[in-house]
Design a protein with these regions (language model features):
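Terminal targeting signals and extreme-terminal segments of soluble enzymes
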Residues: 1-179
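Single conserved hydrophobic/aromatic residue that forms the stacking wall/gate
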Residues: 177-187
Length: 187
């Protein structure tokens, strides 16, 4: 599968059809998984909410609840409640419904871009992407540490290329931090 078809397949997960005012639908498209992963339905609810607001607003707060597992083979209906439409702030509540039951619920606040305080750490001096090993290169390099029955999953092409500045050895877990309880001596 080429990079283009992987990306096109992934982007297809986010094409929502307008059913009515504030109601959108996504037709299930199985891409090899039985269940819908959280990031997908979160992105879809955010897209549904964005379709009901002015473009000058951007999401600045997102609170959500995963209620039930979703099924990739079934369509999802997204209902958007317009809680508030203000000059600076807009609020939406979105429910993702599958088979008549909510699988995901969220509340999203949008804000107009305004000048304000900015708290940001200075960018550290790190290697550029071309100097780092890609995740696919790393997976190929250590595939012999993985049981062969998992090679197809381990080595499958990914939609997004990751390059870690400080690579983590996922196959050699270790405790990075621990501390005693403040009242450890009383236990």
């Amino acid at each position: 599968m080429t990079d283009k078809t992987i990306l096109e397949r992934s982007l297809g997960l986010f094409n929502l059809e307008k059913v009515d005012r504030d109601i959108f639908s996504w037709t299930g498209k199985n891409v090899g998984y039985k269940r819908i992963f959280g990031g997908q339905v979160m992105a879809q609810t955010l897209i549904a909410a964005y379709k009901t607001i002015d473009v000058e607003h951007y999401a600045h707060s997102f609170h959500s609840y995963f209620l039930r597992p979703g099924n990739m083979d079934k369509s999802i209906t997204f209902t958007v409640d317009r809680i508030r439409d203000g000059k600076s702030f807009t609020t939406r509540r979105v429910r993702a419904i599958q088979g008549g039951e909510a699988i995901f619920n969220c509340s999203i606040s949008f804000k107009v871009k305004e000048k304000g305080l900015s708290h940001q750490a200075e960018m550290p001096n790190i290697s550029g992407p071309d100097d780092l090993e890609s995740e696919s290169e790393m997976r190929k390099r250590i595939k012999n540490k993985i049981d062969k029955k998992f090679h197809s999953i381990w080595l499958r092409e990914r939609e997004i290329e990751m390059r870690q500045v400080e690579p983590i050895d996922y196959l050699n877990p270790c405790l990075l931090y621990t501390s005693p309880s403040p009242r450890d001596d009383e236990l």
